[in-house]
């Protein structure tokens, strides 16, 4: 380093960048045959700061454009899931806030944003799993479905809760970074409810014990996962997966929860202002949106787990009109799928409105919701799909109400010929 003062006999040194002599600046730093003054260093630092700031702004703008807004998330859900408008809105906001939080994790800030996991409550076949699957596909993140009924505490026969993270890793080719931003959907969460309000002296390895094990996973922990799906043994190197930023969505039918809610509301609704309404008159779909944490505790979930699932969305039971829409409107609607299957044989499929209504009514009677629609349609088309490759000249297959009820076979329309019934010679 060359100081400002120097003897006249010494050779005068100059900054290699601005050309100022050592007498014109405070400091002159020497490198291998190169010199730089303090003023040029300050200027370089200023340029670097400005460029870094511009890069951060561009990254923030890119983040906003990459992440779909709640309205866009809702519109995407509408393409695949019919009805459940309030649940879609709640999910869209929760998922948007979660991934917006992840985008800003690296920034230093006084306010630390906590994770908001989601609890979906609704009857079988109302769209809980489909909503979670559609969200993961939209956001292009790893996704896994786990069945809570197969889980047990560590050390007991059954699946360990850490197996969920192992499956998530498998779905993204063991890329830990990707897995740590994925979505885990835990189905049948209501089936691991505590068997009674009072703690039992016997070990509940598939109830409260599993809830306690899930608690750490959902809250955020370092899960040890064997590489490439191997079994755990002491002398093995494990993959460490941080679950802090994994979004957990838990779903369940919670059969009987409406009774717990009605008992609570009956106690609070006393006096002249109380609305007199019999339990039979109150639909489950009307009661479930009134769910409070105390109801879930009474049902059998532990308070700590409920606290880790702050976003609660309830799904309504699907009526006949909604089930008919599900058959024909979504992008991957069942009718469209079977029309495509028959189109591969060069045959058109027509399902009349009366048949759609009959399918919906049958699903409601079976209490299977949207999940039961496929089996009803498959059963009605089974004989046609079996015989169709052997038939020649079939132009169209027509399904009417009598086909669904089993009173008549599907109608086959031949090219320039009179219609015939399937299976007749």
Curated annotation (Swiss-Prot):
Residues 3-56 form the ClpX-type ZB domain. One of its GO terms (biological process) is proteolysis involved in protein catabolic process. It comes from the Bacteria. Keywords: ATP-binding, Chaperone, Metal-binding, Nucleotide-binding, Zinc. It holds the Pfam family ClpB_D2-small. SMART domains: AAA, ClpB_D2-small, zf-C4_ClpX. One of its GO terms (molecular function) is protein dimerization activity. ATP binds at residues 123-130. InterPro entries: AAA+_ATPase (IPR003593), ATP-dep_Clp_protease_ClpX (IPR050052), ATPase_AAA_core (IPR003959), Clp_ATPase_C (IPR019489), Clp_protease_ATP-bd_su_ClpX (IPR004487), ClpX_bact (IPR046425), P-loop_NTPase (IPR027417), Znf_CppX_C4 (IPR010603). CDD domains: RecA-like_ClpX. Zn(2+) binds at residues 15, 18, 37, 40. Signal peptide: none annotated. GO terms for cellular component: HslUV protease complex. Component of the ClpX-ClpP complex. Forms a hexameric ring that, in the presence of ATP, binds to fourteen ClpP subunits assembled into a disk-like structure with a central cavity, resembling the structure of eukaryotic proteasomes. ATP-dependent specificity component of the Clp protease. It directs the protease to specific substrates. Can perform chaperone functions in the absence of ClpP. Belongs to the ClpX chaperone family. This is ATP-dependent Clp protease ATP-binding subunit ClpX.
